[in-house]
Amino acid sequence: MQASCNQLHDPPGTAHEDAAASPCGHSRSTEGSLHPGDVHIQINSGPKEYSENPSSRNPRSGVCTCAHGCVHGRFRSYSHSEARPPDDFATESGEHGSGSFSEFRYLFKWLQKSLPYILILGIKLVMQHITGISLGIGLLTTFMYANKSIVNQVFLRERSSKLRCAWLLVFLAGSSVLLYYTFHSQSLHYSLIFLNPTLEQLSFWEVLWIVGITDFILKFFFMGLKCLILLVPSFIMPFKSKGYWYMLLEELCQYYRIFVPIPVWFRYLISYGEFGNVTTWSLGILLALLYLILKLLDFFGHLRTFRQVLRVFFTRPSYGVPASKRQCSDMDGICTICQAEFQKPVLLFCQHIFCEECITLWFNREKTCPLCRTVISECINKWKDGATSSHLQMY
């Protein structure tokens, strides 16, 4: 009875807060503490319910109400948990993006940790192939120096140095002979005439070694022929004719270089069958045939260009007609390209006059007139400036 009186003397706000804080726990404790002689008075938290039911209620009805509230609360929490998946999906997508970023971080850290070991391995590989790397750098430097010098001498025309051209010829020939003499035991010069060098077993690096050296030597050989043409006096072979010879030699060099690596690569591809079973041998034959087909397609793809070069070389198309003195006087007798008096003036189809040598050098790279941009030449005459292709034919 004292406990019930204490409940009566408690302020309504306190009872309301306790009921709101733990309604189910309060109902259970109340139900468990009832005795036959005690009187329990239910204090409702809502004013509406208090006005409708001023009398005391059955404890079980309070328990049921509390149970209903607990079930309703659980249902609401369950409904909220089902309404959250879109947020969860957004969170998962964010985690996926952060996961991919973390993978890149791990990869970067792995590279940082592995860098010393990669350097050690790289130094070891360089030391194993130091001869080939040094020789490749030397051949490339020689080619760049000779190619630039030949182009400069062709551009100078009558002012070119015969001594410089002779030095380039001796330098290229001496470099080739010294290289083959140093490695005479391998008979690398055999590959120039479509024969295999004297190597028992060809590995991948040895194939690259043979093909690379042969390609540079062929370039040196045709560059030496260009030096010989430079040494020919202009009264025997005009500069215009020399340009056509440079173009023809370069095209011949490129087509010859297409076929030279074929025997070496064919032997390397087909050599798999010597140490394997029938399947491996068949695979080697198939790879070799596929290589030959690709080389033939490459050749026929360049055949059209080669025919155009031959047609230009034999027909020697003109860009105009010789200009008269009256026509030159109308142009003040000065060539707009060289800013000097006309030397063998040529009247283009667009009625502009230039020196024959000046306009020939111009059309080595361009198709249009220098002044009015009228198309005069149908094709660009490549390689007439004496240049050599820097492409390395490794296959």
Curated annotation (Swiss-Prot):
Stretches the record annotates as Disordered: 1-58, 78-97
Location(s), subcellular: Early endosome membrane
Topology within the bilayer: Multi-pass membrane protein
Pathway stated in the Swiss-Prot or TrEMBL entry: Protein modification; protein ubiquitination
GO cellular component entries: early endosome membrane; endoplasmic reticulum
SMART domains linked to this entry: RING (SM00184)
Major subcellular location class: membrane
Its EC number(s): 2.3.2.27
Keywords: Endosome, Membrane, Metal-binding, Transferase, Transmembrane, Transmembrane helix, Ubl conjugation pathway, Zinc, Zinc-finger
Name the UniProt record assigns to this protein: E3 ubiquitin-protein ligase RNFT1
Organism (species): Mus musculus
Gene, per the UniProt record: Rnft1
